[in-house]
Design a protein with these regions (language model features):
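Extended substrate/RNA-proximal surfaces in nucleic-acid metabolism proteins
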Residues: 2, 54-178
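An N-terminally biased module of ancient metal coordination in phosphate/nucleic-acid-related enzymes
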Residues: 1-73, 167-173
Length: 179
């Protein structure tokens, strides 16, 4: 059986996202594009995961809670979780304390919107989310595993924010089983 998926989707919460990237728009576009499985992987946060999970459930799409964590070395790593609760706990206990308290400049990066399942704004994250955490690239896999999550280096072959562009190598000794 073939499955069509996208495990690297950002919402209106990510600074690189657009205000149109609401839970319903994400899921409805996924349906229109024939996707069976999606993961929301905003930068260093899971605050819109619960809303997208609910919309995906109603639409019959398999949803995987996720996050795109930026390491201390400025490498992006997708973390995919078994549940919304595990993702939110990982953010609260591991990522949030490791993210510098630098304010988001809304004039440049836009509003980082937290939305409900009806696309209503219920808050905003005032920290600049697309920033390096103090978590090292070789510790992400171990930390994610504590929450039964899988860590996968993101866009590994891109010229920025990837294992190859920053370190020039990818090795299983770094704790990743998937590249």
């Amino acid at each position: 059986m073939k499955y069509y998926y996208d495990l690297h989707i950002h919402s209106a919460l990510s600074p690189c996202g657009d205000e149109d990237m609401t839970p319903n728009n994400i899921v409805n576009m996924s349906v229109l594009n024939g996707l069976d499985i999606i993961a929301l992987s905003d930068h260093n946060t899971c605050k819109n995961v619960r809303a997208v999970s609910e919309v995906a459930r109603r639409a019959g799409i398999l949803f995987i809670p996720g996050m795109e964590l930026e390491t201390a070395e400025e490498i992006h790593v997708l973390c995919l979780f078994p549940s919304v609760d595990a993702a939110e706990l990982f953010e609260r206990e591991i990522v949030s304390p490791a993210l510098p308290d630098i304010p988001n400049n809304e004039r440049i990066f836009g509003r980082q919107q937290v939305l409900d399942e009806n696309d209503n704004e219920i808050g905003a994250d005032g920290r600049y989310l697309i920033n390096a955490t103090s978590i090292t690239v070789d510790s992400v896999g171990v930390l994610a595993a504590r929450y039964s999550a899988v860590a996968i280096p993101a866009h590994i072959d891109k010229q920025t924010k990837s294992l190859l562009s920053v370190l020039g190598m990818a090795d299983k000794s770094m704790g990743y089983n998937v590249f």
